[in-house]
Each structure stands twice: as C-alpha cells, then as structure tokens.
A protein has these predicted regions:
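Glycine/threonine-rich flexible loop motifs
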Residues: 72-74
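Conserved SAM/SAH cofactor-binding pocket of Class I
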Residues: 1-64
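A short glycine-rich, Lys/Arg-flanked "PGG" loop and its adjoining helix->strand segment in the class I
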Residues: 76-88
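Class I S-adenosyl-L-methionine
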Residues: 102-134
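Conserved beta-strand signature within the Rossmann-like core of class I S-adenosyl-L-methionine
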Residues: 89-96
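Short, well-ordered coil/turn elements that cap or connect secondary structure elements
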Residues: 15, 42, 87, 112-114
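Short, glycine/charged-enriched secondary-structure capping and boundary segments
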Residues: 13, 35-37, 76-79, 107-110
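Short "lid" loop at the C-terminus of a central beta-strand within the Rossmann-like core
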Residues: 68-70, 97-102
Length: 134
C-alpha cells in the first residue's frame, strides 16, 4: 500500500499536472497520506482503497512496491487487476527484492499477462521491473 505516501507525494511534487492515486487497505495509512498531501498543498493526490478507483480509470504510470509477502496467488490477483488498466503507451514500475522472486515475477508477467517486462534498474538487492502495455 501507499503507507504514509512517500512514493505518491514524490510523484505528485515531480509531476505538477498529474492526478495521483495512492492506494492502501489500511485507513491509518490513507489518513497519513491525506494529511501529508494537504501539508504539501497537493490537491491532486487521492488516498483511497482500491474500491475507490472507478473501473473506467486508466493509468499512464503506475509506481508500486507490491506486497510480495502476501503470497503468489494474492500478488498475481493484484497485478491482474491493475496492470491491464495501463493506458496505451503506459508503463508500470514495480520495486521487488531480488531474493523474493523478482526474476520469476518478471517471467510471470510476460507469460501470463502478455506484457513486456524488463529490468529497469537493480541496486542493493532490489530490482525495478518495467512493465509496458503491449
């Protein structure tokens, strides 16, 4: 989830015209993100649960540190829900620990979702996977 909002807030500060959706299942985390966005004057940040995003919304960019430890079935369901919602030409960046299956996740995205997926960056045991719309 978005936690207190570091990724969402950084993206909103860097992209002054973008609408940023920060998702979490934890209401405390969502409240912290909302408060931090308000303190920074970021009215374009929406902190909500996944149910708060209308089905017709498409994303140009997704940044995520997906919850790998929830298990493959839950993780795969999550990715099946959100990655296909990338707009044409959209891209997703997924931060995954190498020792928690970044390579197998990359192969799964390519084979199961049919989406091009490659390593965007790698450092200190983490990989950033880049997923593009086909």
């Amino acid at each position: 989830g978005c936690g207190w909002g570091p990724i969402a807030l950084t993206l909103a500060l860097a992209s002054r015209h973008a609408t940023v959706h920060a998702l979490d299942v934890n209401e405390r985390a969502l409240d912290l993100t909302r408060r931090n966005a308000a303190a920074l004057g970021l009215e374009r940040v929406t902190a909500t649960t996944a149910d708060g995003i209308p089905d017709d919304v498409r994303f140009d960019l997704i940044w995520s540190n997906p919850p790998i430890r929830v298990g493959k079935a839950v993780l795969h369901d999550l990715l099946r829900t959100w990655l296909p919602r990338l707009a044409p030409g959209g891209v997703a960046y997924l931060v995954v620990q190498k020792n928690l299956g970044s390579d197998s996740l990359q192969r799964w995205i390519e084979s199961e979702l049919g989406m091009p997926c490659g390593r965007f960056a790698s450092s200190k045991g983490f990989r950033v996977l880049e997923v593009r719309t086909p």
